């Protein structure tokens, strides 16, 4: 096992070499991106050695080399947990990052700060590796916050654009809400169990884990863009396409789901948390799939599909299948990163045009990119024998055979069908039909950096699902009987989605313009969530604050207490002291009546 742990640590150390290099003159060299890409590829190849050893032997390792500090009775040490989840995820993340970095060398070649961009990507990858291999909550929190801050820096890379700055701040603010849950969980474990070590937490027999698990669920909701904290993910598409491909499809956004997988031993017997996870994931996967149907920005459609797949992973955890959720994380990384890279290739070729209504006919001028996009879309929908099929089909089968509420299962099936619909929509608008872009644009995809990076992920999108699914324990699957209609459910709803999209396409051809319906507005305006949360809520808050400030400060203190109070007291005192009101006629009449009455009384007595 020494070789096992040594190879893994070597792979992690290799990644830090370009960071150390940034303090030397080599950092200013034009070849620095090449050094970073090469270091990532070597780290991937070395990490495959312990992964293959683990698959063969099935023994996990915990490395605790460096004791950091002791707080009263609690010890904090640097500890790495090399188990199934970390051993499979590390090579997948390194392979995807290797391809994305090669793609970035083509996509960002004209950026004057490309060296800093690659350093940020590498720092993000290192913090993600720290998160995945952490064996205690403190180390996990370092990786958790690391991916958060690197996400902020990379989303706001083009800081001259207002939208990019707003999107970066939005991502940080939504993730801070999730971080509150993470810190609350850490505090609870510290107060009640006096440990942050994962093994010690798991062996504790405490039935009252609702509060820390709710904190973990809140943390996962923020980081994995679940319903309620979801708007930051589509907004993050303002960053460069390589950032979207790496952070917001295959690594950072799955950190929340990975956190719940890590703490699944605490969740598996807690029905309350599992039900919440199931319902939250089901709502997310349906809502974001509906939103994706009417979007026109190609990157935002892919972003909403990411959020929908994250909801599907949460559903899988909710039905007590963490290994299937992890399998979907790994398979999803290949085709989703490739979809973003194909989108980036199209956007770059069309002079930064992202509207699918202004594309069309690209299969003639970008044959390799469009072929990869179609295969990636088919893998996303779960087409048989592509990578997505091996995880998505198993998830739908597990949901069909589990004793959960049929409501969550039904809306998950609807979302699966809608996935096929919006994937078909991208193909129709962007790839097929007549070109709708300027004929003056020179389109060229003959660049080895672009072709090789997409080609590697294309191979992964076809074969990776078969390879990874056969390494999940137990490797020998027991025989299981299932009715044909249940077995074919996933494929049936996918085909239904394709048919629905084709029918809608045929129906809408040649129609006159009509004002959009309320359903269309609900989908295109993202369920009015950004309008309510980002416009109405701040406006209402500012209006109430302004009114209360002006009424309390100006009207009450500055007017009533000082100037108005003086005049009020003067008028009140003058009213009390002087009863003279200036009514001369009334006074004269009163005087005459009094005189006449007095004379009459005197005459009467006389």
From Swiss-Prot:
It is a multi-pass membrane protein. It is an enzyme of class 7 (translocase). It holds the Pfam family Proton_antipo_M. The keyword Transmembrane helix applies. InterPro entries: NADH_DH_su5_C, NADHpl_OxRdtase_5_subgr, ND/Mrp_TM, NU5C-like, Proton_antipo_N. Keywords: Electron transport, Membrane, Mitochondrion, Mitochondrion inner membrane, NAD, Respiratory chain, Translocase, Transmembrane, Transmembrane helix, Transport, Ubiquinone. GO terms for molecular function: NADH dehydrogenase (ubiquinone) activity. It is found in: Mitochondrion inner membrane. One of its GO terms (biological process) is electron transport coupled proton transport. It comes from the Eukaryota. Its main location: mitochondrion. One of its GO terms (cellular component) is mitochondrial inner membrane. The chain crosses the membrane at residues 1-21, 43-63, 87-107, 117-137, 140-160, 171-191, 241-261, 273-293, 310-330, 365-385, 409-429, 457-477, 488-508, 582-602. Its EC number is 7.1.1.2. It catalyses: a ubiquinone + NADH + 5 H(+)(in) = a ubiquinol + NAD(+) + 4 H(+)(out). Belongs to the complex I subunit 5 family. Core subunit of respiratory chain NADH dehydrogenase (Complex I) which is composed of 45 different subunits. Core subunit of the mitochondrial membrane respiratory chain NADH dehydrogenase (Complex I) which catalyzes electron transfer from NADH through the respiratory chain, using ubiquinone as an electron acceptor. Essential for the catalytic activity and assembly of complex I. This is NADH-ubiquinone oxidoreductase chain 5. It comes from Canis lupus.
